[in-house]
Each structure stands twice: as structure tokens, then as C-alpha cells.
């Protein structure tokens, strides 16, 4: 395993650990999710380029589109929650209320 793969896997692991540790604020959770998606994008791109997989060359672009949609939805939820409740604490949100 080359150093590039180790660094990308380490970035994914650190983002996942950040998601587990800093889950009190919604903004920090969204940033950790974006870090995970970015490391997955780079890992897929490097793997496809080094193995010359021409049929899977569109897969990283599709992943990037889904990551952009996830970021837009997450930020819109963050704005809605901060306008409604005044904070972005995750523990203050009760998802069973309508």
C-alpha cells in the first residue's frame, strides 16, 4: 500500500473520528461528513487513474455531485434549525416533534 493511500485512509479515519467526537454542533458534524466525502472522492479518483479503469471514470464525478447535494441540504437544515431554535446544538433537537 503506497503512502498516498495511507494518507487518504488516515484523512477518512480522522474525519470519522471527528464525527464521533464533535457531534454536539451540527456544523462540525457537517464539516466532518464533508471531509469523509472528500477523502472518498480522492481515493476513488486515485484508484481509477492508477488501475486505468475507463468504465468507472464517471463514478467520482457522481460521488462529487451527491456530496454537493448533501452539503446543500445540510446547510439549509442548519439555517432552518438555527433560525427556529437559535442554536445549532444537536442534543437540543427532538426529532419526534412536528
Curated annotation (Swiss-Prot):
Q: What class of enzyme is it?
A: translocase
> Its Gene Ontology biological processes?
ATP synthesis coupled electron transport
**Which parts pass through the membrane?**
1-21, 30-50, 61-81
Checking InterPro entries in the record gives:
NADH_UbQ_OxRdtase_chain4L/K, NUOK/Mnh_C1-like
Task: List GO molecular-function terms, semicolon-separated.
Answer: NADH dehydrogenase (ubiquinone) activity
Catalysed reaction(s) here are:
a ubiquinone + NADH + 5 H(+)(in) = a ubiquinol + NAD(+) + 4 H(+)(out)
Q: Which residues form a coiled coil?
A: none
Major localization class: mitochondrion
Highest taxon, organism lineage: Eukaryota
Documented EC number(s): 7.1.1.2
- Localization (cell): Mitochondrion inner membrane
* Membrane topology category: Multi-pass membrane protein
Keyword Magnesium annotated: no
Q: What UniProt keywords are attached to this protein's entry?
A: Electron transport, Membrane, Mitochondrion, Mitochondrion inner membrane, NAD, Respiratory chain, Translocase, Transmembrane, Transmembrane helix, Transport, Ubiquinone
* Record GO cellular component, one term: mitochondrial inner membrane
The UniProt entry's sequence similarity note says:
Belongs to the complex I subunit 4L family.
What is the recorded function of this protein according to its Swiss-Prot or TrEMBL entry?
Answer: Core subunit of the mitochondrial membrane respiratory chain NADH dehydrogenase (Complex I) which catalyzes electron transfer from NADH through the respiratory chain, using ubiquinone as an electron acceptor. Part of the enzyme membrane arm which is embedded in the lipid bilayer and involved in proton translocation.
Q: How does it assemble?
A: Core subunit of respiratory chain NADH dehydrogenase (Complex I) which is composed of 45 different subunits.
Q: What is this protein called?
A: NADH-ubiquinone oxidoreductase chain 4L
- What is the gene name? MT-ND4L
